[in-house]
């Protein structure tokens, strides 16, 4: 029988790395975080396993330029959410070797704030993560970035949230438009206010996914384009 295993390669920006005493400490932290991600993904009830292939903590001298290239002009304390995803795609498309090549999802963890600044706006909309929708298994597209600015509150929820975007789900309350999946059920039937992970995350439901999210992920996983997450169970 086939098992569904989503394999991750995690990279951390130099500011994130600086919070730890060693590269091993970064890896240990991310490993604990992924236990939390697995617990949240389990609420989809789709028997999806998450597997951490490895972690590369960037340091000032080794950090690729795509991170600094993604800062919001005039607001350099922020990473531009749209730019970071675009620049990550380009970088890992050109550096498609090793763990980056093996991974189903490549995720960047940063400590800087992330935001979106629309033309004409002066206020930045702050967000916790950004990713390429429905792009698991799609080389050169299978990327996301998450903010984690606290040593104690491991942001497993943000990683799980962005993972599910990559696995074909919109936010609760949103239809399938923009998913790039013509026959996806979308999530318009599950109100944002129900408080699930892809919605407003309330006390009652904030640690689980809605039925709509489940159906969207199930749909993408039924397509040939998601074949990279299937493997022989004996592995």
From Swiss-Prot:
Q: Which GO terms describe its biological process?
A: membrane protein ectodomain proteolysis
- Residues binding Zn(2+), per UniProt: 161, 165, 171
Kindly indicate whether the keyword Calcium belongs to this entry: yes
Q: Which cofactor does it need?
A: Zn(2+)
**InterPro entries the UniProt entry points to:** MetalloPept_cat_dom_sf, Peptidase_M12B
Q: Where in the cell is it found?
A: Secreted
Which PANTHER family does the record cross-reference, listed alphabetically?
ADAM A DISINTEGRIN AND METALLOPROTEASE DOMAIN (PTHR11905), ADAM METALLOPROTEASE (PTHR11905:SF159)
Q: Which family does it belong to?
A: Belongs to the venom metalloproteinase (M12B) family.
Q: What does this protein do?
A: Acts as a metalloprotease. Penetrates intact tissue and specifically cleaves the vesicle-associated membrane protein 2 (VAMP2) (part of the SNARE complex) involved in pancreatic secretion, thus disrupting the normal vesicular traffic.
UniProt-recorded name of the protein: Venom metalloproteinase antarease-like TpachMP_A
